[in-house]
Design a protein with these regions (language model features):
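N-terminal alpha/beta PP-like core and its mobile active-site loop of ThDP/TPP-dependent enzymes
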Residues: 1-278
């Protein structure tokens, strides 16, 4: 659900093996930056370290849940008391609602689960919606418009970031042929003339041939250039072409290739600004 919609999803599991069975799914969510809240059970705090059934507190030789999930979650906490629950929930919500989310895991010991908490606590978790000023990217958007106007055969490589940002309509209005990564499938209707199918070693090669043989401008929108998408980083894909890269995660910019124009920002907002400049 989180992958398809970009909305926060949740799962609840028991302590011990219930938590450890989530490892692969959580790891995938971490890599894909999916907003998933995981709530697990835990033995009561007063028996930590005493060998309680399915204990994973890390005490007394038990499984250390913090060590297990620390590298595959954006935030992990064993909630041992309710007096700081508001701070925990604020931190969790901040990550889940951020432009670069990821899995959050909260472990609730059995005795904490039975405590009473005033429901008004939830009213104190308030976050402003992120905004993107049309003028904040004015110069880069103008440069992108100039490069697109000058190109004879531009191609868009759309990834999962397009789906997350809700850029489907703006991308269609742009009117440029689109190929997608596997995670970006669905960002364009594959029955439309603009759709080139998937780009990568598991595809039919149509998008690869279009880029290598014809494209003079390649525009990456929320798309990685991993081993599979790049045909093992085939240099012919980008050789002699101008490259624009837009991503809402700054760490992804120019991670694999050098772009002529690299933009950190919201993909949908930037495309909408671009459409206004192009008069589309």
């Amino acid at each position: 659900h989180a992958r398809a919609s970009g909305a926060i999803s949740a799962c609840i599991t028991t302590a011990g093996p219930g938590a450890t069975n989530l490892v692969t799914g959580i790891a995938n969510a971490y890599v894909d930056k999916l907003p998933i809240l995981i709530v697990t059970g835990e033995t009561s705090t007063f028996i930590f370290g005493k060998g309680g059934m399915q204990e994973s507190s890390g005490e007394g030789g038990s499984i250390d849940q913090a060590a297990l999930f620390g590298s595959i979650t954006r935030y992990h906490r064993i909630v041992e008391r309710t007096d700081y629950l508001l701070q925990v929930l604020r931190q969790a919500a901040q990550i889940l609602l951020s432009p670069n989310p990821g899995p959050v895991l909260l472990s609730l010991p059995y005795n904490v689960q039975k405590e009473m908490v005033n429901a008004s606590l939830l009213d104190e978790i308030r976050f402003g919606k992120a905004t993107h000023s049309a003028g904040s990217h004015a110069s880069t958007t103008e440069e992108m418009a100039r490069m697109i106007r000058a190109a004879r055969h531009p191609v868009v490589v759309a990834g999962y970031g397009c789906l997350v940002s809700g850029a489907q309509v703006a991308l269609r209005q742009l009117g440029i042929p689109v190929t997608t990564t596997l995670k970006g499938k669905g960002v364009v209707d594959e029955d439309t003339p603009l759709a080139l199918g998937c780009l990568g070693v598991t595809s039919d090669g149509r998008a690869y041939r279009r880029i290598v043989d014809h494209a003079d401008l390649v525009i990456f929108l929320g798309a990685g250039f991993n081993e599979r998408t790049s045909y093992l980083w085939d240099a012919r894909l980008l050789a002699g072409k101008q490259v624009i890269q837009i991503d809402n995660d700054a760490s992804q910019l120019e991670k694999v290739f050098q772009a002529d124009l690299a933009i950190h920002g919201d993909i949908r907002a930037l495309l909408e600004d671009l459409l206004a400049l192009l008069g589309t």
